[in-house]
Amino acid sequence: MTEPGARPEIPATADCRCLSLAAGRRLRTRVAGVFLFLPLLARMHFDQQIQQAGYPGSRLVPATSALLSLLTLKLLDKERRSHINDFNFDEALGLFAGLNTLPKKSFLTDYSYRTQRAHQRTLLAAWVQNLAPLLFPQAEAFSLDFHPIPYRGDPSGLERHYLPRRGRAGPSVLSFFAQEQESRVLCFANANLTRADQPGEVLRFVDFWHELTGHDPQWLYFDSKLAPYVELSRLNQRQVNFVTIRRRGAALLRRLETLPASHWKPAVLDIPKRRHQHLRIFDETIRLRDYDGPIRQLAVKGLGRERLTLFLSNNFPETGRNLIQRYAGRNRVEDGLGISVNFFHLDCLASEVRLNVDVDVAMTVLANGCYRWLARQLRGFDKAAPKQLYRKFVETGGLVEVQDNRIVVHFDKRAHNPILREAALDHACPPVPWLNNLPVVFTYP
């Protein structure tokens, strides 16, 4: 029973100067698994990425610690910034971010208002440049998509976009994502978008990738809403192969549906577990308004829809079957966005201010990369979703011990510890700059 007049204990103020790394210090935490990501962050020079991006910081909470605090919420399946208060007294998580304790919700909210789109773009560029050699060294194809993040408050000042989960348009903040096709890693995002910016976003991603690698992407897959025909023409002029969907007009459908059966060629999609594999394809070359030159159109029956599906591509050497099979892989970006909504809580809108949301979206990209890296390291879990990885590995209690020349994380006994031991995530872990250049070591009972 609470004593009369007793008050709740007040947590300490986040201050990097109060972080103690004295040998012998031992900190208990119920989510010691978050330290599994430290070797990756140290190897990728995360602190240097933050400095190069120019994020603001203070004497109490440097920029690196502020961004690590925001990233921690994403890694720990927390819906809102206010949920950081769940860890007010978890000094081990403060140590993870280079602080004595994690900042409060008011700091994180205020901090996001101090950032600019240039900060996020520079950070994403550095992040992808360092992550690519580890997860997608031969990146060639990307799936692109818009995702409207619904707003449930006063809709004044916000544009209305179609919300698939509601089946109607509503006030929302529009975000854009690009995902590398094979690794399923999110590699670009932008939430500082208006409806006027929407048509040119595909080319902005192409420019982003060109700046990173010195060449344009080889293949892009996206639906009909992402780029008008004039933007498709610009992609063609830059020799970027694309496959997209064409909107179906009534007159166009009538013409195609009256074609004789001999015009339709059979094809089989070699995709395991796909329900509709046997197709019939009519392949033709057409011209479109605002598109310079010929373009290839594929009319397809057998995809499980009542009417034809129309594909457009500027690639002529590939077979029609291969183009459709390439586009079928675009479902991965929709799956990835579904994961971002369910685990990284993308739809829990941080604010009605787009720049504020842009920070949250950038943290989603970083958290996605962290979990894809973790999945790649664990034998048998390379295709595991973040929620599964979190439940089996990250959501593990443990003891963080500071020793003379290293930080040791002692994990509690769990059934999946042998998989972590086999992965040896801490092998050759570089010094962690925001922890006095101490390396991290993991031990398992």
Question: How should each PLM-predicted stretch be described?
Answer:
Residues 91-94, 150-152, 185, 195-196, ...:
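Flexible loop/turn segments at secondary-structure boundaries
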Residues 1-168, 175-195, 202-212, 236, ...:
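Dynamic "connector" segments at or just before major functional cores
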Residues 7-14, 233, 238-335, 339-342, ...:
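An anionic, glycine-rich sequence signature occurring as long contiguous blocks
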Residues 347-406:
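Basic, amphipathic alpha-helical segments enriched in Lys/Arg and hydrophobic/aromatic residues
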Residues 193-251:
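Domain-level cores of phosphate- or acyl-group-handling catalytic modules
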